[in-house]
């Protein structure tokens, strides 16, 4: 089901960032009639990641009674962290890998501001370099934030673009990067992969790798299977459609102590009950309410909880599993059957790996805190954690070492984990030769496959926030959204939208969300230019016949 698109409008005075063209999307009008006492409404949020915590926040701030059920022992979902014991008995931290908190993540930042109004718990990184095999590094430092000057300056400076390569670019197709209008652009590129889109552009090989490494692989996806519309939305969100820039912030310490534990305490102060270590098994109707069966993972212990509304804020596997185990959810009519089929079609991305190393010596001082790579085999990026995380800095100072993290995205089926682990370390030694003589005093290895793959299937077949069951809404980065948002920001945005849907359906006020501009920054000019070039090409082709 497609959400009703409302005309964005600027909100008075407040701006979530520096971009004057950021758009505010108001919530639906509250349902007519006398609104209920919000305290008489109870919502169960299934999932304590970004989407679930955002939905819980949006509901609780309007007085609704909220219960959060989270399968893991800590909040944060796929952006959680947890303690590990190092060989000397001290405590280190592990996570599922590096996450960039971009300045255009307006709705996620709104959540974080509840406990950190000035976002002091985030620190900026000065650059996001990308090292290409065979030499050459792209850098985003010092590039203007405002389009089109950011694009012009990046192309001028980047070794990925040269005059010969630029001459081969299809100008008509390239103008499509600027000629966008979301959500219509999502539909227009149904069936087109990221690789197809770049084929149309005729980008130079270096620039093609840059686009795929910076955008597509960060979605844990093979570019031949990843949506071209999503890739175009990312170009828009991070580069040609937003004036916030491509540089980003990172938490000053581990995700749990910096972000989610403070938010958990804030939610507790609003009356939210958070239960970790609880896995929801099925959702069913019980009169005019919904009932959820939940228990400890891998345990026969279970209990029922009733609610007036339910938010499913789960990863693809969790969402598919709960809906499949809840035969009546969504109703038995055609709309319900179609919705359940769409949920079953949500795809999981290939697996990814994270290797964190506690080394007995220092990485060279000039190494970037975070380095993306292209053409370095399975190695996609390298993080030197003591450059930005306090706990890693303290360990490095005390032991004269470094804490380094290696990522490998979109692993092929049947990957030999032992061979991959060895390969990643060897690639690190080639990139940072000073590490070849260092010893790992501790290692943490993680392989997961629970991220969403936004494929080339029709955009309208992806399940959205709204479901055929008015008491049930979805949230998460696997959920379709009309706006040009992605990853953590899609999770937060759909969390706010899910809360607003329930609130306004009960006659209570919602919150609304912000986004980068939903259309190109240059009005009709790119579209006119594209059509002009297309007409000229068609005329030339007829003349040559």
Question: Can you name each region flagged by the protein language model?
Answer:
Residues 2-19, 23, 39, 278-404, ...:
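Mid-domain catalytic core of redox enzymes
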Residues 5, 9, 173-282:
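Active-site/ligand-binding neighborhood in enzyme catalytic cores
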Residues 39-68:
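N-terminal Rossmann-like FAD-binding beta1-loop-alpha1 element of flavoenzymes
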Residues 60-85:
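Glycine-rich FAD pyrophosphate-binding loop
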Residues 108-109, 113-114, 119-228:
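Mobile amphipathic helical/loop "lid" adjacent to a hydrophobic cofactor/ligand pocket
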Residues 391-398, 448-482:
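FAD-binding beta-loop-beta segment adjacent to the flavin cofactor pocket
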Residues 479-502, 506:
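A conserved FAD-binding loop/helix module that cradles the flavin
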Residues 501-545:
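Active-site-proximal substrate-binding core of FAD-dependent oxidoreductases
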């Amino acid at each position: 089901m497609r959400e009703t698109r409302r005309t964005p409008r600027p909100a008075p005075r407040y701006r979530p960032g520096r971009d004057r063209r950021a758009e505010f999307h108001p919530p639906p009008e509250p349902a007519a009639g006398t609104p209920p006492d919000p305290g008489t409404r109870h919502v169960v949020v299934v999932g304590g990641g970004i989407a679930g915590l955002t939905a819980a926040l949006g509901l609780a701030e309007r007085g609704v009674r909220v219960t959060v059920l989270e399968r893991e022992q800590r909040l944060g979902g796929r952006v959680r962290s947890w303690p590990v014991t190092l060989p000397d008995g001290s405590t280190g931290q592990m996570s599922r890998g590096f996450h960039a908190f971009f300045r255009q993540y307006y709705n996620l930042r709104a959540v974080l501001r509840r406990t950190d109004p000035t976002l002091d718990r985030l620190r900026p990184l000065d650059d996001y370099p990308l090292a290409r095999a065979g030499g050459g590094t792209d850098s985003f430092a010092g590039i203007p934030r405002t389009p089109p000057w950011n694009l012009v300056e990046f192309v001028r400076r980047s070794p990925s673009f040269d005059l010969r390569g630029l001459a081969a670019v299809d100008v008509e197709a390239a103008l499509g990067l600027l000629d966008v209008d979301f959500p219509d652009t999502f539909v227009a590129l149904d069936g087109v992969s990221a690789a197809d889109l770049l084929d149309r552009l005729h980008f130079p090989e270096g620039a093609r790798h840059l686009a795929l490494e910076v955008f597509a692989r960060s979605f844990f996806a093979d570019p031949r299977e990843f949506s071209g519309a999503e890739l175009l939305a990312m170009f828009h969100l991070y580069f040609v459609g937003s004036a916030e820039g491509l540089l980003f912030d990172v938490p000053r310490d581990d995700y749990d102590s910096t972000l989610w534990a403070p938010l958990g305490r804030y939610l507790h102060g609003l009356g939210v009950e958070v239960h970790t270590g609880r896995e929801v098994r099925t959702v069913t109707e019980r009169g005019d309410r919904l009932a959820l069966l939940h228990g400890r993972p891998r345990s026969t212990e279970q209990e029922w909880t009733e609610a007036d509304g339910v938010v499913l804020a789960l990863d693809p596997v969790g969402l598919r599993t709960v809906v499949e185990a809840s035969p009546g959810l969504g109703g038995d009519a055609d709309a319900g059957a179609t919705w359940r089929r769409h949920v079953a079609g949500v795809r999981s991305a290939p697996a990814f790996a994270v290797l964190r190393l506690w080394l007995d010596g220092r990485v060279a001082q000039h190494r970037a805190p975070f380095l993306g790579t292209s053409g370095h085999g399975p190695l996609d990026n390298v993080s030197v954690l003591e450059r930005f995380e306090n706990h890693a800095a303290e360990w490095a100072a005390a032991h004269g070492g470094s804490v380094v993290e290696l990522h490998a995205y979109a692993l092929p089926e049947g990957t030999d984990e032992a061979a991959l682990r060895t390969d990643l370390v060897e690639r690190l030694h080639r990139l940072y030769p000073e590490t070849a003589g260092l010893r790992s005093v501790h290692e943490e290895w993680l392989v997961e496959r629970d991220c969403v793959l936004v494929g080339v299937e029709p955009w309208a077949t992806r399940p959205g926030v709204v479901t055929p069951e008015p008491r049930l809404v979805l949230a998460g980065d696997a959920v379709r959204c009309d706006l040009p948002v992605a990853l953590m920001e899609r999770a937060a945005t759909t969390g706010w939208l899910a809360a607003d849907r329930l609130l306004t359906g009960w006659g209570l006020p919602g919150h609304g969300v912000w986004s980068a501009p939903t259309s190109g920054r240059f009005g009709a000019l790119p579209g006119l230019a594209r059509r002009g070039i297309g007409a000229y090409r068609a005329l030339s082709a007829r003349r040559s016949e």
